[in-house]
UniProtKB/Swiss-Prot annotation:
PTM: Sumoylated with SUMO1. Sumoylation is enhanced by PIAS1, PIAS2alpha and PIAS2beta, and PIAS4, but not by Pc2. Enhances transcriptional repression, but has no effect on DNA binding. Sumoylation on Lys-197 is the major site.
Record key words, sorted: Activator, DNA-binding, Isopeptide bond, Metal-binding, Nucleus, Phosphoprotein, Repeat, Repressor, Transcription, Transcription regulation, Ubl conjugation, Zinc, Zinc-finger
Function: Binds to the CACCC box of erythroid cell-expressed genes. May play a role in hematopoiesis.
Domain of life: Eukaryota
Entry remark concerning the domains of this protein: The 9aaTAD motif is a transactivation domain present in a large number of yeast and animal transcription factors. In KLF3, the motif is inactive.
InterPro entries according to UniProt: Znf_C2H2_sf, Znf_C2H2_type
Name used for this protein in its record: Krueppel-like factor 3
Stretches with biased composition (Low complexity): 70-81, 91-107
Region of interest (Repressor domain), residue spans: 1-74
Molecular function as annotated in GO: DNA binding; DNA-binding transcription repressor activity, RNA polymerase II-specific; RNA polymerase II transcription regulatory region sequence-specific DNA binding; zinc ion binding
Motif residue range(s): 9aaTAD: 60-68
Motif (CTBP-binding motif): 61-65
Organism, as annotated: Mus musculus
Subunit structure: Monomer.
């Protein structure tokens, strides 16, 4: 976990080393306000080297500053034995408390120094490891593996809040799984936006309007707040084909064929030709439907009238009241009977 401490950590002096140090290195190692603290202690591995190769070797931290102008490293008894100039005091970027495990704190370089590439190798803290284990003999050379820092986004938050580091890979995995991830806002990554589900019926539909049917108030421009309200809550739009057409319009007459009675003084109009034929029989007196019951001589101009009449002979009453046990041979008689139940 990354922790950012705005207050410089108290520094403790280490064993002095009598080596001169360039002035430009002192400027580059000034304490910075922000630093990265790696709380996990580094694995300390010590190996015993031959006494012939360890005489004259000086244990010093490795400097990785880009614009360092120090002297080139001098070759020692082995390829790994290198000498680098070190500071007389403890480095400002390294803090080593005596009562806690070693913590390596890295301070970013000054603005004039070119930033390092990623991944980078952190310099091993050899003097801190020696002082921790109580090793003072120059014959033992501690070998500490360098730490490789993976590219993760740094999120600088206030020192009063709990620091949080979110990796890009973890965030992508969480987004694919559908689980919500709490993320603190930072200056280096944009705000996360939630996906909004849009219903298909919310979008306003395009409708063709007839200019002769539109009233003048509808043509007035709508103010922006009203337009936004109409966009969020669209009104019900009736399609032109579903609108009830006027009675006297030519479209209505074309769609609904009107059958008029051609007798003088009769203004009866029917939508079906069969109804017009039955009506014309009232003028002519024709009654083609005759009752077939034995001894019955009744005739009717309409077939439905003959059907109702024939039920008198058979006694069939197909229309039964749901509120009582009475039955009727005609539907209009049943409707009249049910009205009586409603009044009572």
């Amino acid at each position: 976990m990354l922790m950012f401490d705005p207050v410089p950590v108290k520094q403790e002096a280490m064993d002095p080393v009598s080596v001169s140090f360039p002035s430009n290195y002192i400027e580059s190692m000034k304490p910075n306000k922000y630093g990265v603290i790696y709380s996990t202690p580094l694995p300390d591995k010590f190996f015993q080297t031959p006494e012939g190769l360890t005489h004259g070797i000086q244990v010093e931290p490795v400097d990785l500053t880009v614009n360092k102008r120090g002297s080139p490293p001098a070759a020692g008894g082995s390829p790994s034995s290198l000498k680098f100039p070190s500071h007389r005091r403890a480095s400002p970027g390294l803090s080593m408390p005596s009562s806690s495990p070693p913590i390596k704190k890295y301070s970013p370089p000054s603005p004039g120094v070119q930033p390092f590439g990623v991944p980078l190798s952190m310099p091993p803290v050899m003097a801190a490891a020696l002082s921790r284990h109580g090793i003072r003999s120059p014959g033992i050379l501690p070998v500490i593996q360098p730490v490789v820092v993976q590219p993760v986004p740094f999120m600088y938050t206030s020192h009063l809040q709990q620091p949080l580091m979110v990796s890009l890979s973890e965030e992508m995995d969480n987004s694919n799984s559908g689980m919500p991830v709490p993320v603190i806002e930072s200056y280096e990554k944009p705000l996360l936006q939630k996906k909004i589900k849009i219903e298909p019926g919310i979008e306003p539909q395009r409708t063709d309007y007839y200019p002769e049917e539109m009233s003048p108030p509808l043509m007035n421009p709508v103010s922006p707040p009203q337009a936004l309200l109409q966009e969020n809550h669209p009104s019900v739009i009736v399609q032109p084909g579903k609108r009830p057409l006027p009675v006297e319009s030519p479209d209505t007459q074309r769609k609904r064929r009107i059958h008029r009675c051609d007798y003088d003084g009769c203004n009866k109009v029917y939508t079906k030709s069969s109804h017009l034929k039955a009506h014309r029989r009232t003028h002519t007196g024709e009654k083609p439907y005759k009752c077939t019951w034995e001894g019955c001589t009744w005739k009717f101009a309409r077939s439905d009238e003959l059907t109702r009449h024939f039920r008198k002979h058979t006694g069939i009453k197909p229309f039964q009241c749901p509120d009582c046990d009475r039955s009727f041979s005609r539907s209009d008689h049943l409707a009249l009977h049910r009205k009586r139940h409603m009044l009572v």
